Amino acid sequence: MAKHLKFIARTVMVQEGNVESAYRTLNRILTMDGLIEDIKHRRYYEKPCCRRQRESYERCRRIYNMEMARKINFLMRKNRADPWQGC
């Protein structure tokens, strides 16, 4: 087995013959890396217009999720100024 980080990060050891948990772990790693979605998209030919639409949608969704996470983190801060001081 290669000592390259790319291969180490996607290597799962089977402990005590427990193949199911190792498979679930490997599946989770591949999903988090985005490889499962990439393989699904490359399985069949995707027309260029559909690919542009999908990539545009994914880009917009990524921006939306980042902004929403930023807003939620701002709201979850404890030391922010109280906006309703007079009430």
From Swiss-Prot:
Pfam families: Ribosomal_S21
The entry's keywords: Mitochondrion, Ribonucleoprotein, Ribosomal protein
GO cellular component: mitochondrial inner membrane; mitochondrial small ribosomal subunit; mitochondrion
Subcellular location: Mitochondrion
Origin: domain of life: Eukaryota
Chief subcellular location: mitochondrion
GO biological process terms, semicolon-separated: mitochondrial translation; translation
Family: Belongs to the bacterial ribosomal protein bS21 family.
Subunit structure: Component of the mitochondrial small ribosomal subunit (mt-SSU). Mature mammalian 55S mitochondrial ribosomes consist of a small (28S) and a large (39S) subunit. The 28S small subunit contains a 12S ribosomal RNA (12S mt-rRNA) and 30 different proteins. The 39S large subunit contains a 16S rRNA (16S mt-rRNA), a copy of mitochondrial valine transfer RNA (mt-tRNA(Val)), which plays an integral structural role, and 52 different proteins.
Name of this chain's protein: Small ribosomal subunit protein bS21m
Originating gene: MRPS21
